């Protein structure tokens, strides 16, 4: 679990979702353990100065590569990065079923290659749910688990 001094930092652009989240956190007695940064992640992340143990990416698929580039300098060595939806309903590995998801699917195909080959990560894509990326930051270069 998270230590008593631990803090979760989350980024959210929607004021409606922030209000809803704050309400849930308050009712759960966890409001003081979570800091919500308002805005788009690509605009907020460059201003973060903390070092993180864990980064979870679940946002616009076309921007995943940029999120990873911004997150890695903030992640401690040995820290974990988790990325959601990397198999995109199977479309990443096969035929695109929905034309409106072509850009997202192609972006995820590119991202998955970048992720598993990244020189600062030991990473893989797991076929859990809709595809989960799991990587550990290391300075020793990539390897397969």
Regions found by a protein language model. Give the residues of each.
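S-adenosylmethionine/decaboxylated-SAM
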Residues: 1-145
